Amino acid sequence: MASSSGQNGIQLLLAAEQEAQHIVNNARTAKQARLKQAKEEAEKEIAEFRAYMEAEFQRKLEQTSGDSGANVKRLEQETDAKIEHLKTEAERVSPDVVQMLLRHVTTVKN
C-alpha cells in the first residue's frame, strides 16, 4: 500500500510538473505574442511619424524654395535701384569732381 501511495504521489508530481510546464509555455507564448504586437504597433507609429515628418519637410522645402525665387527677384530689383541711384549721384557730382581735380592739378604750389 505504501508503494502504491508513493507511486500515486510520483504520478501526481509528474502531472503537476507537466501542468506547470504547460502553464509556463502558455505564458511564454502569450508574452511573445504581446511583444510581437507591441513591435508591430511601434513600427506602425514610427512609419506614421516618419511620413508626417517627411511631409512637413517637403512642405517647408516648397515654401523656402518658392520664397527664394521671390527673394532673388526682390534682391535684383533692389540692386538695380541702388545701381541707378549711384549712377545718378555720380552724374550729379561728376562736374564738381572734375573741377576740383583740374584746380588741384593746375594749381602750382611752392
UniProtKB/Swiss-Prot annotation:
Keywords attached to this Swiss-Prot or TrEMBL record, sorted alphabetically, are: Hydrogen ion transport, Ion transport, Transport
Which Pfam families is this protein grouped with? V-ATPase_G (PF03179)
Membrane-spanning residues: none
Identify the InterPro entries for this entry.
V-ATPase_G (IPR005124)
**CC terms in the record's Gene Ontology section:** vacuolar proton-transporting V-type ATPase, V1 domain
Name the Gene Ontology molecular function terms of this record: ATP hydrolysis activity; proton-transporting ATPase activity, rotational mechanism
Q: Give the family, as the similarity comment puts it.
A: Belongs to the V-ATPase G subunit family.
Name the NCBIfam families for this protein: V_ATP_synt_G
- Function description: Catalytic subunit of the peripheral V1 complex of vacuolar ATPase (V-ATPase). V-ATPase is responsible for acidifying a variety of intracellular compartments in eukaryotic cells.
| Complex and partners | V-ATPase is a heteromultimeric enzyme composed of a peripheral catalytic V1 complex (components A to H) attached to an integral membrane V0 proton pore complex (components: a, c, c', c'' and d).
> What is the official name of this protein in its record?
V-type proton ATPase subunit G 1
Q: Which organism is it from?
A: Nicotiana tabacum (Common tobacco)
